Amino acid sequence: MPHPLSRIFLIAPAMDSEDRNKAFGIKLPLLGYPAISLAMIAALTPEDIHVRLVDVTNESVPYGEACDLALIVGQTHHMPSAYLIADRLRTEGVKVVLGGMHVTAFPDEALEHGDAVIIREGEAVWADILDDFVKGTLKKKYYGLEVELSNLPVIRRDLFNKKFYHPGEIIETTRGCPVGCHFCAVQDFFGSSFRVRPAGDIRQEILNIFGPRPPQAKWKNWLARNWHPDIPYFVERRLLYVMDSNFISEPAHARAVLEVFKECDIRWYGHASFNLARDESMLDLMAESGCIGVNIGFETLSQTNIDNMHKFPNKTDEYADCIKALHDRGIGVMGTFMVGFDDDTPEVFDQIADFVIENQLETAFTLILTPLPGTEIYRQMDSHDRIFSRNWRDYDHGTVTFYPKNMTPRELHLGMRHTWKRIYSLCGIWHRILKKPRVRPFFYFPVNMGFRKSMRLICSEKVWPVPEDRG
C-alpha cells in the first residue's frame, strides 16, 4: 500500500544575492558542499516517499510541482530567502517545516512563515513529523533530542547533483564541540555533549564511497614520482572532507578514525582546534593517514580577545609553532580569523595579513565578527544596544551589523577587505604557496587562484556596499 504522504521537498536556501552566493560558492576542493543534514533526513524518510533535495544556490525551487511537505533548513543569512520560499509554497497548499540554528534561536519568528518548526536537531523528531502530517495533527514546535550517531543511517548521496560541488566526498565522524566559544552557535544547537560515530561505521561508509584502492597504472605511478604523490588521489577523486566542528575533541576516537583513513588510503582535510599541535603523535598519525590540510580557527592575534570569547584552547604566542609543526609534516594550514572584536583597532588588518603571509598559511579566511542569534555574543551585544541591523541577509560575515568598540563600521568593512586583498594578491599567493618551503602547491595554488576570484566579489562595493559611519 503506498504511503499517504507521497512527495517531499528538502530545501537548502541560498542568500538572496546571486553575487554573494558566487563569492562563497565557488566549485573548488575547499568550497561548495552539499546539504548533508538534509541528505540525512532523506535517509530517515520511508523509501516509498519520493524525496527531492533542492539546493537553491545551484537550482530553482520547483514551484508548481506536486508536493505534500517541505522542510527548509538554512543559516541566518539565508532566512529572508527561506521565508519567501516558505510563503510561496504555502500558497500552493504545501505544508512547510523550518529548521536550523536560526530557527532554533527564533522559533516564533519562523512560525510566521511555516506550519511547524524544529528546535535543535531534526533526526530524532522527523518520524514524528511525518506521522503527525499523515494524521493531520502537525504540531507547531518539535524539540529535537541529541541523537546518538551510531543510530543514524548513511546519508542519501544519490540525491546530490555532483556537478554543483567540490570533487571529493563529505562525511561526519563526530558532532558538537566542547569549547563553547561566545561567537559560535554550535553548543546552542547541538548541546554541550560531544558525540562520536563508531570507527567501524566510518570505515564501512568510506569503503562504500570509494571502494578499495585499485592497483596503480604506470602513468599514475609516474605522476606520483615525478610531480606529487597526491596527484593520483585527485585523479581518482579519493578526497574526503570531514565536516566535524572539531575532529580531535575526543583524542582516542580521533586516533581510531585516523587509522581507518590510513587503511582506506585516501586524502582528506577537516577542522581541528589549535591544541592539536601540542600532540606530536597525533600530528604524525594525521600525516600518515593522508591529511592534506586542517582548518584551524585562530580567530584573532589578541589573547585578550581569545579570553573574552572563551576560546580557551588558543594561545596566540604558540600560533607560529603550531603552523610549523603541521607544515613540517606536509599538512597545509587553513586559518580562519575574525575582525571586530573589542580589543581590535584599525591596525589589526595589516597584523593579520602580515601573520598569514609570514607564516605561509595555505589559505586564510578573514571574516567580520557577526553576532549570530543563539550565541553569547549576540546576547551581550543585544543587552548593550550595540546591534544596529537585524536584516538577516547581512549576517553573512561580510557585513557589519554592530557598533565596533575601537573603530567605525566603515573602517571595519574596508579593513576586512584590505586583509583579503593583501593575502590573495599575486605577491601574497606566491609568498605563501610557491616560495620554499612549501606544502602541496599542486593542490593549494589553484585553490588560492579561486579565492582570488572570490575576493573580487567580496571586495566589490556593488555586492557589499560600504556602510555609512554611525554615531
Regions from the language model: what does each represent?
Residues 15-20, 108-109, 252, 304-309, ...:
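Flexible glycine/acidic-rich beta-alpha junction loops that bind and position SAM and/or redox cofactors
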Residues 109-128, 285-295, 351-366:
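Structural recognition of alpha->loop->beta junctions
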Residues 53-57, 73, 188, 272, ...:
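Residue-level recognition of beta-strand->loop/alpha-helix junctions
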Residues 62, 67-72, 76, 255-261, ...:
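Short, electropositive alpha-helical surface patch
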Residues 2-236:
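Acidic, low-complexity intrinsically disordered segments
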Residues 1-10, 18, 28, 47-53, ...:
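Radical SAM enzyme core and accessory elements
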Residues 154-334, 341, 347-350, 354:
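Radical SAM [4Fe-4S] cluster-binding motif and immediate context
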Residues 44, 48, 88, 92, ...:
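Alpha-helical structural signal in soluble globular domains
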